[in-house]
Amino acid sequence: MLWELYAFVFAASVVFNFVGIVANLFIIVIISKTWVKSHKISSSDKILFSLAITRFLTLGLFLLNTVYIATNTGRSVYFSTFFLLCWKFLDSNSLWLVTFLNCLYCVKITHFQHPVFLLLKRTVSMKTTSLLLACLLISAFTTLLYFVLTQISRFPEHIIGRNDTLFDVSDGILTLAASLILSSLLQFLLNVTFASLLIHSLRRHVQKMQRNRSSFWNPQTEAHVGAMRLMICFLVLYIPYSIAALLYFPSYMRKNLRAQAACMIITAAYPPGHSILLIITHHKLKAKAKKICCFYKLRDFVSN
């Protein structure tokens, strides 16, 4: 039974990772070609391009680690630490980029008059590069905190100092743990807030357009409905992912193999699922994907 569960989780993780790698590589290629041709790139595409690169590296690293685990009975402690830190940094960066992308969508589409919202509206598009760098720095800082926390937790509860006095490190551990949890909690609250505001604003706009039936379905309304669907599907994927990622690491969860397997599958399904959502709701990416699908269908039809 355990072997069957392990094989199922392993196969599902490999499939999800492979799909995610292909989807993000597709985003990278299409946006980079458009960037080279036009010599300019929009703020949303710049964030999307950075997110695709980060996820491509994350999923590639995760796939390599999965293959390594399957083909090696013993694991190096240094390799495990290196993999965990790289994954922590890339995963944190991708989540902050998603938060940034949701923020950009929210301030561009919605029309709220709150001072904080108006400040975001003025600064987000103008300082995209600086905010992308901020995402990197925050991710590096939280990864460093995580590394320090894991190193401190290896020491005894009380450590003897140079002057032969005892000092308790539990306060430091709690502080670092609180910093990491608050960072994840901040991401979660921001993403849910931006997505909820966007869904609320778009729903009001669509209802308003429905009352004016003569101009109900136009390209702008279609784009708004697509953005609303994207945010709803994003929340459906993101909320279970956040819960599963939070529950995966505690020691008591490691004793429940079924719960741990469910958490692993949910966390593996989120990155490729969200990447596919971004493709099908992005006009250029969706058009290019349709062309590729039509090409392969035509080729199969001719070959048959």
Curated annotation (Swiss-Prot):
Chief location: membrane
Keywords: Cell membrane, Cell projection, Cilium, G-protein coupled receptor, Glycoprotein, Membrane, Receptor, Sensory transduction, Taste, Transducer, Transmembrane, Transmembrane helix
Transmembrane segments: 11-31, 47-67, 81-101, 129-149, 172-192, 230-250, 261-281
Positions glycosylated per UniProt: 163
Keyword NADP part of the UniProt annotation: no
Any one biological process term the GO annotation gives: respiratory gaseous exchange by respiratory system
Tissues/organs with expression: Expressed in tongue, stomach and duodenum.
SUPFAM superfamilies assigned: Family A G protein-coupled receptor-like
MF (Gene Ontology): bitter taste receptor activity; G protein-coupled receptor activity
Extracellular side of membrane: 1-10, 68-80, 150-171, 251-260
Xref: InterPro entries: TAS2R, TAS2R4
Disulfide partners: none
Note: Several bitter taste receptors are expressed in a single taste receptor cell.
Function: Gustducin-coupled receptor implicated in the perception of bitter compounds in the oral cavity and the gastrointestinal tract. Signals through PLCB2 and the calcium-regulated cation channel TRPM5. In airway epithelial cells, binding of denatonium increases the intracellular calcium ion concentration and stimulates ciliary beat frequency.
Family as reported in the entry's similarity comment: Belongs to the G-protein coupled receptor T2R family.
Name of the protein this chain belongs to: Taste receptor type 2 member 4
